[in-house]
Amino acid sequence: MRFEDLVYERPDFDGLVGEISSLLDGLSRSKDREEFFSLHKKIEDSFLKIDELYNIVSIRNSINTKDEFYDGELKLFYEHMPRFDELKHRLGTIRLESKFRSDFEEKYGKTITMRDKLQEDTFDPSIMEDRVSESKLVNEYYKLTGGAEIEFRGEIKNISGLLAITQDRDRDTRREAFEALNGWFAANMESLDRIYDDLVKIRTKIANKLGFETYTPVAYKLMGRLDWDSSDAKKYREQILEHIVPLSQKIYADQAQRIGIENMKYFDLPLSFLSGNPKPIGDEDLLVAKALEMYKELSEETGEFFEAMIDKGMMDLTTKDGKAPGGYMTSLPLTQMPFIFSNFNGTSGDVDVLTHEAGHAFQGYLTRDMYPSENNDLTMEIAETHSMSMEFFTHPWMEKFFGEDSEKYYYDHIASAIKFIPYGASIDEFQEYVYANPSASPKERRAKYREIEKKYLPHLDYDGNEYLENGGRWQRQLHLYTDPFYYIDYTIAQINAFQYFVMDMENHEKAWDSYIKLCKISAKLPTKKALKEVGLESPFDDGTIEKILPKLTSYLGSLDKEKIK
């Protein structure tokens, strides 16, 4: 069945809560192993039902934020989902206290019960109303940014549509596009400040109710981080400052020379090449057809996966009016299919969706029937390793998408990935400050972000733009609003993906087998153990970053300079 044909009927929330509660009562009283496992399966099936319906609503709301029906349904889910979170917490408590715990761990591994313990630390009935308020504020941010209507040269653009123009070869066009974009954010700064301030205060309130001084450790536990914490993140950021920031500055200097602008302003940065950034050849239909060819050639598994995505209509790719910004992959657990959402806008980012989000989706497809499904509840640094690594495994096929621009794509892909890491670290360090200082004013937050930004991104010249000079850039980063402390995961995953890129150049079969193994391990092992199991070095370890950088710079140096202008 195709996605558009999936029938949505509002669930009987009260009935499902009652049904699961009754099953949980039975689980806690299980007399033997068989009864315990049988009831556990029934409980899982009930949770999957509500997850499936929620994801259908969420996807359809993302596709059209102006659809009042799905907007209303999503608000209903936001109100009721904390009740199901409480039931999931109860399931975890029962597992931890059950006399069949060792049987469960023997059959399904210990990681689920380790996460149950994290959940014990982060849940209390007293925070339910606060979680509802948090969800409503997150939805308010999505609605505000998703509904942005920005005038540019007589036309109305959304955020994604305007970002595409910021890569234009004409400098005045880039400047005007950025001024329009930042003008919208500046005009909405007070609303964005209020939403974020309310979120920080609610999250701090939640942390205090749970017995924590700040929200930071709560966020780490909620992210399922079993074997690394904020002290690991701090040491990791120090490695970025020492090794990656200097390399990124050299890449920016090379860019300035290449595009002939000695003192680049912020609106020059998206233009990597004077001849124009690499653009994919073709519209959505052609790009998807090329992606199918690519995945069939890459492996039997990837070919089967992508064909199913097309046949079942599990992608909504091109930007349009009312569509939420960004891109993501999510899963429909009963349909047993992943779904890819994005905003194609005619840039190389369109191809990145067909590799990055497809990497997420491929892993979801490989593990679509995993039981218990909690063994597929990925930590984000592992999830993003799946997606970012797929970007590199598909490198040999980029000529299909870019033709003569493929050499530029290869360069820009690696260079942009290196340049991204300091930005990701800046967002993480900013959040450390925000949640350590929840009473800071919006003005103080912006000043702190600008201070951090100068440390990790010293090349930035905002050309006197008041909104940016005062530290407003972070408000465009939705993760700060929606998923506290998530963003550093992208950088950790990037280091893992770089390792796969280097390994793939040396031995494709070894690299691909390791990647498939990592996908199938899913969430059955904590991060450091999973990486060790598949032969990757931990990004937190001293020397991991330093070791791979020479191979990346060597690769960049090997590309044809005549084609990179």
Question: PLM ranges: what are they?
Answer:
Residues 1-277, 564:
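A well-structured
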Residues 113, 117, 318, 354, ...:
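C-terminal, non-catalytic "cap/extension" segments appended to globular domains
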Residues 122-123, 180-188, 228-234, 269-280, ...:
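Glycine- and acidic
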Residues 127, 131, 185, 189-193, ...:
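Hydrophobic alpha-helical scaffolding
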Residues 157-174, 280-355, 359-364, 466:
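Active-site-adjacent "gating/activation" loops or surface patches in catalytic cores
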Residues 242-243, 367, 378-407, 413-415, ...:
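Post-HExxH zinc-binding segment in Zn-dependent metallohydrolases
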Residues 261-290, 363, 414-420, 425:
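Long, K/E/R/D-enriched contiguous segments that form extended
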Residues 359-373, 393:
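Catalytic Zn2+-binding segment of zinc metalloproteases
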